[in-house]
A protein has these predicted regions:
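N-terminal Rossmann-like dinucleotide/flavin-binding domain of flavoprotein oxidoreductases
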Residues: 63-81
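Active-site phosphate/pyrophosphate- and oxyanion-stabilizing loops and adjacent acidic/basic residues
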Residues: 134, 177, 209, 235, ...
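Gly/Ser-rich helix-loop-strand patches that form or flank binding pockets
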Residues: 99-152, 240-283
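Small/aliphatic-rich secondary-structure junction motif
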Residues: 1-54, 158-224, 240-243, 271, ...
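A short acidic, glycine-rich active-site loop
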Residues: 53-66
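A short helix-to-beta-strand connector/capping loop
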Residues: 78-89, 215-221
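Charged docking surfaces used in two-component/phosphorelay signaling
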Residues: 87-100, 228-231
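Short glycine-rich, flexible loops that bind phosphorylated cofactors or substrates
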Residues: 13, 122, 168, 230, ...
């Protein structure tokens, strides 16, 4: 892992994401790039266009000052007097966030995006942050770690990967193992079934044997759990096992509306309770 992106609007939620991104970058010896975007409002007269242009210029200058200060603080905190290659820069654009992140991940070789997301009792501004996170996940071909505004950094000790035995699971697990190795974290591969059966047990055993053969020496564990609802089963397992990050595979557009169930999509985005790492399947 060499390069990490982290969008910020300087809100409390974004600050949490910057904390997570900085800790991961410091531990991995990676470069961190902060992103901030501004939008020129739609105008219908030359007079309002002039006012809007002046406002945009003011916003850009203010954001640039904040980004410079934040990068300086992060380099002082995470780069100074540590055995780390941590460095930080920023991108400031008048553009849509999805356009900027898609371009950077496609052309600049970024390995991970870290973004803030919010809970169901959020303000409208905070809900827009959650909406941006979902939009970025849908557009980029890069892992995205969404960090709830309520999350506190406690290291990465255990990553829980939710599998449904999709063809892309094994490739996605490579990214999970890569992140886990940075922290020496355990990785639990978890499959949820509504009820136990010999067929399910046989499929689970076959899948687990494949993983054991591929990931020798990796602290990888497999667990099949029984729950009528996948979202509740995963959440309970995550809490019981003191998970640090829940990882899932995005297989198609709109996956956040179809991931296991509608309720899981809701709980893991706008009502997020845990850091969620979304791995991208083939587009």
């Amino acid at each position: 892992m060499k390069k990490i992106l982290c969008p910020t609007d300087f809100s409390g939620t974004a600050t949490k994401a910057v904390k997570f991104a900085s800790e991961i970058a410091q531990q991995a010896g990676a470069h961190l790039t902060l992103i901030h975007v501004v939008h020129l409002p739609i105008v219908d007269t030359s007079e309002t266009a002039l006012v809007a242009s002046e406002l945009l210029g003011e916003q850009m200058r203010d954001a640039s000052d904040k980004l410079k200060q934040l990068c300086s603080q992060l380099e002082e905190t995470y780069g100074a007097n540590r055995e780390s290659n941590f460095t930080c820069d920023f991108v400031l654009k008048e553009a849509l966030l999805t356009d900027v992140t898609e371009h950077l991940t496609k052309h600049e070789g970024y390995d991970l995006i870290v973004m803030g997301t919010t809970g169901c009792d959020s303000t409208m501004e905070e809900l827009l942050i959650g909406s941006n996170t979902e939009a970025v996940i849908e557009e980029v071909n890069c892992p995205v770690l969404s960090v709830p505004g309520t999350a506190e950094w406690q290291g990465v000790n255990k990553i829980i990967y939710a599998t449904d035995y999709a063809p892309g699971d094994k490739e996605a697990l490579e990214k999970v193992v890569e992140l886990g190795s940075v922290f020496g974290a355990d990785i639990d591969v978890v499959h949820v079934v509504k009820e136990a059966s010999p067929e399910a047990a046989a499929k689970a055993e076959s899948f687990w044997l494949e993983l054991q053969q591929k990931y020798t020496g990796v602290p990888l564990h497999f667990q099949e759990i029984v729950s009528k609802r996948a979202d509740e089963g995963l959440k309970d397992y995550f809490k019981r096992e003191n998970g640090s990050i829940l990882a899932v595979l995005r297989k198609e557009k709109g996956f956040l509306q179809n991931l296991f169930s509608q309720s899981l999509a809701e709980k893991m985005t706008y009502q997020a309770e845990v850091p969620l790492l979304v791995l991208q399947g083939h587009k």
